[in-house]
Amino acid sequence: MFLLYFRLGFQHILPLGADHVLFVVGLFLASTTLPALLWQVSAFTIAHAITLALATTGVVHVPPSIVEPLIAVSIAAIAVENLVERAFHWRRPLIVFGFGLLHGLGFGGALQALGLPPEDVLVALLGFNLGVEAGQVAVLASLALAVGWCQGAPWYRRRVVVPASAAIAVVGLYWAIQRLA
């Protein structure tokens, strides 16, 4: 049971979760140090674990018609912040925590759609959540291998962060409009 839901959680990120992948890419781009990245990823993880559990167990219900456009807006917002802020700021993990709450509602909706075994809700929830985390770690590791070597370069912001964040913002806004239609 655990492994089945772990796999489903991983697949919700890779290959099915382009929106969540872009959000994680946005976090990575603005994090030129490991501590900055860890603060943000930890805030995101804690937040989405909370709302994933609340949504999956039926304690909280927010319709996908509200959650999905807001997730897209969160992607655009984190990318725009990457364009505006030149350095890591203490409020960034708080913002990421708030956005993580939204993403957790999205994960919860996906998990509810898959169905939960009544006798193993906690095992399924834990497996799915850890699968999501493993997917995010895979994305971050891939990014570290691809561009981590140049994060300290003087041209990194101009040549990597700005164009990639601009593209992510455009995609996030497009998805928001598409999900509202």
Regions found by a protein language model. Name each.
Residues 1-181:
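Membrane metalloprotein/metal-transporter helix-bundle signature
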